[in-house]
Amino acid sequence: MFSSVGWGEIFLLVVVGLVVIGPERLPRLIQDARAALLAARTAIDNAKQSLDSDFGSEFDEIRKPLTQVAQYSRMSPKTAITKALFDNDSSFLDDFDPKKIMAEGTEGEAQRNKQAADNNANVVERPADGSTARPTQNDPKDGPNYSGGVSWTDII
C-alpha cells in the first residue's frame, strides 16, 4: 500500500505534523494512528477467518481457477504454451529452437559448400614463368558510339 512512499515523504509529513499539531501532541497522534492501523488489520484477518470457516469449500472451488490464472501470468510465454498444450513436455518446442537449428547443417549451407568446392576445382593455375595474363578492360571510350559523355538529347 505504501510502497511508493519514500523516506523523504515520511520526513516531510513528520515536519508538517510538528508545525501544525505541535511537538506535545504529535507522539500521541502517531500512537493513535498506529493503533488504528493494527485494529483495522486485526478486523480484516478476523473477517477472512470467519469467511473461510463459513464458506471454505465454496471458496476453494473459486480459488482453483484463480490460482491457475496466477500461475500462467507468472510464466513466460514458452512455458505457458508448453504447459497448456503439451502437458509440460517441452521437447516439442525445443525442436524449434533457433540456436539448435542454426548449429546444425542446413540445405543452404550444404549448397554453399558444394559451390565452394566446384569453384576451387575450376581454378586456373598460373604459368610457371611468372608472366600473368592481364584482363582486358572494357572502357566505354573504346566503343563506336562514344560521344564524350554529353548528348544533344540531354540538352534539348
Swiss-Prot record:
S-S bonds: none
Composition-biased stretches, type Polar residues, lie in 113-122
The principal localisation class reads: membrane
Carries keyword Transmembrane helix?
A: yes
Q: Which domain of life is it from?
A: Bacteria
Q: Which UniProt keywords apply?
A: Cell membrane, Membrane, Protein transport, Translocation, Transmembrane, Transmembrane helix, Transport
As for subcellular location, the record says:
Cell membrane
Q: Which GO terms describe its biological process?
A: protein transport by the Tat complex
> What does the protein in this record do?
Part of the twin-arginine translocation (Tat) system that transports large folded proteins containing a characteristic twin-arginine motif in their signal peptide across membranes. Together with TatC, TatB is part of a receptor directly interacting with Tat signal peptides. TatB may form an oligomeric binding site that transiently accommodates folded Tat precursor proteins before their translocation.
Report quaternary structure and partners: The Tat system comprises two distinct complexes: a TatABC complex, containing multiple copies of TatA, TatB and TatC subunits, and a separate TatA complex, containing only TatA subunits. Substrates initially bind to the TatABC complex, which probably triggers association of the separate TatA complex to form the active translocon.
Protein family (similarity comment): Belongs to the TatB family.
**What protein name does the entry list?**
Sec-independent protein translocase protein TatB
Coding gene? tatB
